[in-house]
């Protein structure tokens, strides 16, 4: 079964994220559990936790259908010790918030070397950051998102994801989220079913589908291999509809949150309905 939704706003209270997801007939959703552009947030209150859990129960969202995202400020591969510790503390807090809310996944961007350390050293720091967070939490899986490779961001190669996983001690609590726009911008072609087959065969060999815990379904304003992260509405960008139809018809993508981060929230309900319909359409030639 496909879980299909969008990254919805939690403005006015975390419970509102579940309500907003239900309003667009989503069977999955993503959210920030705190302001994503601030380091600190007030601790979750018992009322906030209870209201969020009640809303999820009311609208039939289990933790398997929810893919929270951490703060954009966090860099788990930071080359400077003081800044690395600040990011690690913030990431632990994000993981603990998920644990309190009964959520089992936390999606994050791996990190950046800032041209100050090697890719290998940065990837090792990211893995160690995950190990520290896993040691201080229970029941939450750290879900590494692939990136477009802008600037010094790592995670734009499947090999980067594999290297991080290799350095994580508890393999049962690490996974990946593949963003289609990021993959395309990083040089993984998705424009035809044949290219999708090739890209995900590469993913299967390098990382493995057992680690796939979520996806971000985004078309791309950015061009192929540009290393630029610019999302677009489904079918409106340089990837096109075929990739998303192909994903909907492949059971390897069942049972994980498939999350829209497309640029027009006003048509999310239409995009979700279209994705759902593709599951029963005739397979792409």
UniProtKB/Swiss-Prot annotation:
Cysteines paired by S-S bonds: none
Induction pattern: Endonuclease IV is induced by agents which generate superoxide radical anions.
Keywords associated with the record: DNA damage, DNA repair, Endonuclease, Hydrolase, Manganese, Metal-binding, Nuclease, Zinc
MF annotations from Gene Ontology: 3'-5'-DNA exonuclease activity; deoxyribonuclease IV (phage-T4-induced) activity; DNA binding; DNA-(apurinic or apyrimidinic site) endonuclease activity; endonuclease activity; phosphatase activity; phosphoric diester hydrolase activity; zinc ion binding
SUPFAM superfamilies for the chain: Xylose isomerase-like (SSF51658)
Keyword Glycoprotein set for record: no
GO biological process entries: base-excision repair; DNA repair
Residues holding Zn(2+) 3: 182, 229, 231
Cofactor: binding comment: Binds 3 Zn(2+) ions. Can also bind Mn(2+) ions.
Domain of life of the native organism: Bacteria
Cofactor: Zn(2+); Mn(2+)
Function: Endonuclease IV plays a role in DNA repair. It cleaves phosphodiester bonds at apurinic or apyrimidinic (AP) sites, generating a 3'-hydroxyl group and a 5'-terminal sugar phosphate. It preferentially attacks modified AP sites created by bleomycin and neocarzinostatin.
The protein, known as: Endonuclease 4
The species this protein was found in: Escherichia coli (strain K12)
């Amino acid at each position: 079964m496909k879980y299909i939704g969008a990254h919805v706003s939690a403005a006015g209270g975390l419970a509102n994220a579940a309500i907003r997801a239900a309003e667009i007939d989503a069977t999955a959703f993503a959210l920030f559990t705190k302001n994503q552009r601030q380091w600190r947030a007030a601790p979750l209150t018992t009322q906030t936790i209870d209201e969020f859990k009640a809303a999820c129960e009311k609208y039939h969202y289990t933790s398997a259908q929810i893919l929270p995202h951490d703060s954009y400020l966090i860099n788990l591969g930071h080359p400077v010790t003081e800044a690395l510790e600040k990011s690690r503390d913030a990431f632990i807090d994000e993981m603990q918030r998920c644990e309190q809310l009964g959520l089992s996944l936390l999606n994050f961007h791996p990190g950046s070397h800032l041209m100050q350390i090697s890719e290998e050293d940065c990837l090792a720091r990211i893995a160690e950051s995950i190990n520290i967070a896993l040691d201080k939490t229970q029941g939450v899986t750290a879900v590494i998102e692939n990136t477009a490779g802008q600037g010094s961001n790592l995670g734009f190669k499947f090999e980067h994801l594999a290297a991080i996983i290799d350095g994580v001690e508890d393999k049962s609590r690490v996974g990946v989220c593949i963003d289609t726009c990021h993959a395309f911008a990083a040089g993984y072609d998705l424009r035809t079913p044949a290219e999708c087959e090739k890209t995900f065969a590469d993913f299967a060999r390098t990382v493995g589908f057992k680690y796939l815990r979520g996806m971000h379904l985004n078309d791309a304003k950015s061009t192929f291999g540009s290393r630029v992260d610019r999302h677009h509405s489904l079918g409106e960008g340089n990837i096109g509809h075929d990739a998303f139809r192909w994903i909907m018809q492949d059971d390897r993508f069942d049972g994980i949150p498939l999350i829209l981060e497309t640029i027009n929230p006003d048509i999310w309900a239409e995009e979700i309905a279209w994705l759902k319909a593709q599951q029963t359409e005739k397979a792409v030639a």
